[in-house]
Every structure is written in C-alpha cells, then in structure tokens.
Design a protein with these regions (language model features):
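Short beta-strand micro-motifs enriched in acidic
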Residues: 42-46
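Short, surface-exposed ligand-recognition loops at beta-strand->loop->(often short) alpha-helix junctions
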Residues: 9-18
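Active-site-flanking beta-strand signature of metal-NTP-handling nucleotidyl enzymes
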Residues: 3-8
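Absolute protein N-terminus
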Residues: 1-2, 93
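An amphipathic, aromatic/His-enriched active-site/gating alpha helix that lines ligand/cofactor pockets
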Residues: 24-38, 54-89
Length: 93
C-alpha cells in the first residue's frame, strides 16, 4: 500500500471553502476510485489555516488513477496559499 500526506495552507479566511471543495472531491473519489482506501482532510488544532490530506492507496495503479482523475477535474476555488507539499510513503504496518 502507498500512503500520501499532502500539506496545504488555506489563504486566511478561506478554510471553509477549501473544506467544501475537498468534501465534494472526496465524494467523487469514493465513487470512482475503488483503489483509494482512505481520503481524508484534517485541520491543525494549532493553526486553523493548515490542513493535511491523508490518503491511502491499494497500489501504484490506484495512485495513478487518482492523479489522472485529479488532473482532469475542473479547477477548484482559489483558496490555497500555495502549492501543497506532498509526502509519499510505503505503508509498513
């Protein structure tokens, strides 16, 4: 399995819009990507503009399917303060 942690900072005051966009996209992922085992958004308790998307994929093919779907989606609202930082991990346990 492959785990991904994406860190994204919302522009000040744009957190609710970022959450709504992620929520809508997560529904698409749930319906169209059976190899995506987990796809959640988490907000920092210390910094309300800092978010972590935690993703778990069955295999590399599932990651590639997700990336293709993500690149094909219409642009979301302009709510991020910059590009996400992406950490890709091999799940051990």
């Amino acid at each position: 399995m492959i785990a991904v942690i994406a860190t994204v900072r919302a522009k000040p005051g744009k957190g609710p819009e970022l959450e709504a966009d992620f929520r809508a996209w997560a529904e698409v992922v749930k319906q169209k990507e059976p190899g995506t085992l987990q796809y959640t958004l988490n907000r920092s308790k210390e910094d309300p503009d800092l978010y972590y998307a935690i993703e778990l994929y069955q295999d590399e093919a599932a990651v590639q399917t997700h990336m293709a779907n993500f690149q094909a989606r219409p642009p979301g609202p302009d709510v991020a303060a910059g590009p996400p930082q992406i950490l890709v991990l091999d799940r051990v346990v």
